[in-house]
Curated annotation (Swiss-Prot):
Ca(2+) 2 binds at residues 64, 66, 68, 70, 75. This is Troponin C, skeletal muscle. Ca(2+) 1 binds at residues 28, 30, 34, 39. InterPro entries: CALM/Myosin/TropC-like, EF-hand-dom_pair, EF_Hand_1_Ca_BS, EF_hand_dom. The keyword Nuclease does not apply. Ca(2+) 3 binds at residues 104, 106, 108, 110, 115. Belongs to the troponin C family.
Amino acid sequence: MTDQQAEARSYLSEEMIAEFKAAFDMFDADGGGDISVKELGTVMRMLGQTPTKEELDAIIEEVDEDGSGTIDFEEFLVMMVRQMKEDAKGKSEEELAECFRIFDRNADGYIDAEELAEIFRASGEHVTDEEIESLMKDGDKNNDGRIDFDEFLKMMEGVQ
């Protein structure tokens, strides 16, 4: 088992591994321990994932190291964990977009120092003007005096 495969297993509960194994086995018709790449999309959709054709091609390219056209169960687990993390990242980005809209009180597409200070006051945090200034300076990568959504995402990466 590779480090990547061990890491994938550590990310999943025993229950999830069993669920993935049951789905995997349904498509392993000959019991040989692998499934064809063609069946991969069907299995992933059955497990609640929604990979696009392009994502599937990219996943298969990464997972099917020997180019055999088949994927064994350990490779399958690595792939499923990768897809789950990608889906979670998309969801958290949606949640962050919602936060950004709330923080951007005047809806101009930016968070300025005043709005940033308001966020902290509303959360009960006591921050000084110097701390706000420092946060703005750290977050405002293009130095326009305000934080746009991309800058906000970068700031929040450090928080999660």
